[in-house]
Amino acid sequence: MDYKDEAGEWIGFDADMAKGFAQKLGVEVEFVEIDWDNKILELDGKTVDCIWNGMTLTEEVKAAMDCSNAYCNNAQVVIVPAEKAADYQTVESLEGLAFAVEAGSAGEAEVTALGLDCTPVKAQSDALMEVAAGTSDAAVIDSLMAAAMVGEGTGYANLTYTVGLNSEEYGVGFRKGSDLVAELNAYFVEAYAAGTMQECADTYGVAAALVEQK
């Protein structure tokens, strides 16, 4: 959901909402890149105070963290070169492809469950680069990220997304016992009621995926 702009600043729906939440708390936000596969360890080890970047609310995540209410609907989608899109319109057609997936992601879980060949990489953006370079045949990433980064008018105009593999919800995770969960849920309700959440979603093309906050 997030990426760096030309000035090296983190932007995106999650990043902008996190900045707003930090402002409400009266603190400075710091964005730390982590190994997504180790996100629970990073959180428990206090490398970070929360996990907030398109995190799927899986049973494993909800058991390991105190999580916010869901704020976005999402799905995992298959990314392929646009010129080959017609060949890959069903799950069955994906057999034999070599996939790039973010390690520890919902995308990796989906590809593994289907018994498809995959190579874990550090980030979803790296998975896109693998396909663009021809190192991998396809990738599986979040549909919200795909909408922002793939296709006409993006840096990956020669790629497109085809098959949707599942549906899921995004949430924010904090360490067990954190009082920030209630604070964030309240912030989501306020931002949704004020329309600022929708404005932010419009900016990054994810308005249709927003979950009503109440």
Describe the residue ranges of each PLM region.
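Ligand-binding cleft/hinge of the Venus flytrap
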Residues: 2-7, 18-27, 91, 104-124, ...
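Short helix-initiation/N-cap motifs at beta->coil->alpha
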Residues: 15-16, 30-43, 86, 103-105, ...
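Alpha-to-beta junction loops
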Residues: 26-28, 45-53, 97, 132-145, ...
